[in-house]
Amino acid sequence: MSIVNFGKETRFAIATVDHFINDIAWIGNYNFQVDIDEFFKVADNTNYDNGYGTAYIPVDLMIVFKNGDSLRRFEYDGSEYWKFYPSLTKPTSFRHFKIDKFTDVKYCEKLNEYVR
């Protein structure tokens, strides 16, 4: 059993990925947003067990930063936490892959092996 304060956990996660509260563009999910100050007011008053069991914090909750990076809630085997996702940018150089159909491969680079 590990009781944590959600506000402290969130601030720690933000600092761990070299961001600040004022870097936040929005908090919510793909359909809803919450006021940033209101979010932290509620988070600071929320203590929960982040260990094994059912998820206490919504798993679709995201903090999106102005540069496109994000923190997203993640749950694995009953343990829940923030997971960092860097912003997506187009690579400056890349290799092309051939494709004639999608198969049951896991990665794009493997598609070259299945071109018939």
Regions found by a protein language model. Give the residues of each.
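Acidic interaction surfaces
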Residues: 1-116
